[in-house]
Design a protein with these regions (language model features):
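Active-site-lining helix/loop region of Rossmann-like oxidoreductase modules
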Residues: 1-6
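Hydrophobic ligand-binding cavity/cleft-lining segments
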Residues: 8-83, 186-187
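Hydrophobic pocket/interface hotspot
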Residues: 48-53, 105, 142-144, 177
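Secreted/surface-exposed cysteine- and glycine-rich disulfide frameworks
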Residues: 80-99
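Small-residue-enriched segments and motifs
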Residues: 103-104, 130
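Short, hydrophobic/aromatic-rich segments at coil-to-beta transitions
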Residues: 108-116
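Beta-strand/loop substructures that line and gate deep hydrophobic ligand-binding cavities in soluble
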Residues: 118-168, 177
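Short, highly charged C-terminal tails/helix-capping segments
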Residues: 178-187
Length: 187
């Protein structure tokens, strides 16, 4: 009964460790996730940051180091994955189940959290999560975290090979989103 409830997507709680959806609905994928991320503070309100976060993908791409995102997409396409699939249902609005390029929206709490499931071919299952926290005084913290549930030794090797790039990309990406939110609010 618990697995059926989890598969239906109607689970009321949120957790990352062992979450069936975050493991690509596979039992053979690691229960405990590896994770990497970055954060930045924007001198603007949560709504301005949320608008940039929900605009990710499609024509906007990923705001930072798009050449590396494109390289990963091409690598995925070469092994038969959806890596070069780009686009989204709507340029600024997201809802559960939407596809954003090769990601799927699996969690959304307006102005607080956006959770995307990784859709490329890889030895494991991944999730990219954006969390927004209002700090008061017109400041907002954006935190981006990638969770990776490896499948076997290849999944671990894949994760550890990409950790340096992930740290670089996620720190830069959160800073780029924060600066963009500030510019959009003031402009």
């Amino acid at each position: 009964a618990a697995i059926a409830t989890e598969r239906s997507g109607k689970v009321a709680v949120r957790w990352t460790e062992g979450n069936f959806a975050m493991r690509g609905s596979r039992h053979d994928v690691a229960y405990y996730a590896k994770h990497a991320g970055g954060s930045a503070v924007a001198n603007t309100d949560a709504q301005a940051v949320w608008e940039q976060v929900t605009g990710i993908g499609g024509r906007n791409r990923y705001y930072y180091m798009n050449v590396l995102w494109t390289l990963r997409e091409v690598m995925d396409w070469c092994v038969g994955g959806p890596g070069l699939t780009r686009g989204r249902r709507h340029p600024t609005e997201l809802r559960l189940g939407d596809t954003v390029d090769y990601w799927t929206v699996i969690g959304i709490e307006p102005q607080r959290r956006l959770t995307l499931s990784f859709g490329m071919r890889a030895p494991g299952a991944g999730v990219l999560e954006f969390e927004i926290e209002s700090l008061g005084d017109g400041r907002t913290r954006l935190t981006e975290t990638a969770y990776w549930h490896p499948r076997g030794v290849w999944g671990l090797l894949y994760w550890y090979a990409l950790v340096p790039a992930h740290l670089f990309i996620f720190r830069g990406m959160t800073s780029a989103i924060a600066r963009r939110a500030e510019r959009c609010e003031s402009g």
